[in-house]
Amino acid sequence: MAASIPSDLRNLRACLLCSLIKSVDAFQTDGCENCDEVLHLKGDEEKVYDCTSANYDGMIAAMSNDDSWVCKWQKMQRRVKGIYAISVSGSLPSNVVSDLKSMGVRYKANQRDYSIQAKK
């Protein structure tokens, strides 16, 4: 399985859980191919805006995740093929974090937000 590759660089957002980059429409239509089991973005515009961010840095085209040193460096080996952000600013809403915790999904706020880590 692979995520749809964005054809337009405007109005893109990155998933706050896995950093997959897609358009708002693609998140609404297909959800997040990595996270929709737990985030349930498909068909929910409000949740798409809550669980994604338009503020991200850099892009990685991950096409061969198991063989790529970049995917290993970014801990993306088990993700679908697609375009990923190197760094994503923002964090999931507290109610979503609580839901993730109850499902046994580990989430560390700002884990992939390197702008915050650089300020420390």
Curated annotation (Swiss-Prot):
Region feature Interaction with spt-5, mapped onto this chain? 1-39
Subcellular localization, per the record? Nucleus
Listed A to Z, the keywords are: Activator, Metal-binding, Nucleus, Repressor, Transcription, Transcription regulation, Zinc, Zinc-finger
Task: Give positions of the C4-type zinc fingers.
Answer: 15-35
Primary residence: nucleus
Gene Ontology CC, one term? DSIF complex
- Coiled-coil ranges from the UniProt annotation: none
Q: Which GO terms describe its biological process?
A: regulation of DNA-templated transcription; transcription elongation by RNA polymerase II; transcription elongation-coupled chromatin remodeling
Looking up Pfam families in the UniProt record yields: Spt4
**Known InterPro entries for this protein?**
RPABC4/Spt4 (IPR029040), Spt4 (IPR009287), Spt4/RpoE2_Znf (IPR022800), Spt4_sf (IPR038510)
Domain of life of the source: Eukaryota
Which GO MF terms are attached to this record? RNA polymerase II complex binding; zinc ion binding
Q: Which family does it belong to?
A: Belongs to the SPT4 family.
| SUBUNIT field | Interacts with spt-5 to form DSIF. DSIF interacts with RNA polymerase II and with the positive transcription elongation factor b complex (P-TEFb complex), which is composed of cdk-9 and cyclin-T.
The UniProt function text for this chain reads:
May function as a component of the DRB sensitivity-inducing factor complex (DSIF complex), which regulates transcription elongation by RNA polymerase II. DSIF may enhance transcriptional pausing at sites proximal to the promoter, which may in turn facilitate the assembly of an elongation competent RNA polymerase II complex.
Instruction: Provide the protein name.
Output: Transcription elongation factor SPT4
Organism per entry? Caenorhabditis briggsae
Q: Provide the gene name from the record.
A: spt-4
